[in-house]
C-alpha cells in the first residue's frame, strides 16, 4: 500500500511538468452561448447571446456578420421546411422578484444577410 501511494504521488508530481499551458481563445471571432451550427446556401451560421453571430465558408474559419435582431440570450436555429426558425430567451430580473422569462421566435427564408429574401418575421 505504501509503495502504491508513493507511486501515485510520483506520477502526480511528474505530471505537472508535462501539462501544456492552457490559454484563452485569442483573436477573432468570439461568440457567447453559440447556437447549433446550421448550413444555409453553402455557408455555415451560428448565433450568440446579445444578437449577431458568425458565418463560415468551410465550417472551420469563422467571421462576424451573421444577423439576428432582438438581443436576448442562448439562441438556437433550426431549419423547418424551407425556412429557418430562430428561438432565443429573454429574462427580466432584479431584486424585486420580477424574474419573468420569455422565449421569442423569429422566422427567415435565408440566413444570408446579403440575400434579397433576408428578413425576419415573428
Residue ranges and their predicted role:
Residues 9-20:
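Bacterial N-terminal signal peptides
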Amino acid at each position: 500500500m505504501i509503495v502504491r501511494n508513493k507511486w501515485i504521488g510520483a506520477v502526480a508530481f511528474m505530471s505537472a511538468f508535462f501539462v501544456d499551458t492552457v490559454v484563452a481563445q485569442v483573436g477573432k471571432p468570439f461568440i457567447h452561448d453559440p447556437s447549433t451550427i446550421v448550413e444555409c446556401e453553402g455557408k455555415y451560421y451560428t448565433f450568440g447571446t446579445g444578437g449577431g453571430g458568425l458565418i463560415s465558408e468551410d465550417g472551420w474559419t469563422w467571421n462576424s456578420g451573421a444577423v439576428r435582431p432582438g438581443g436576448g440570450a442562448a439562441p438556437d436555429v433550426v431549419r423547418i421546411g424551407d425556412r429557418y426558425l430562430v428561438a432565443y430567451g429573454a429574462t427580466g430580473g432584479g431584486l424585486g422578484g420580477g424574474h419573468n422569462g420569455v422565449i421569442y421566435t423569429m422566422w427567415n427564408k435565408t440566413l444570408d444577410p446579403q440575400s434579397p429574401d433576408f428578413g425576419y418575421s415573428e
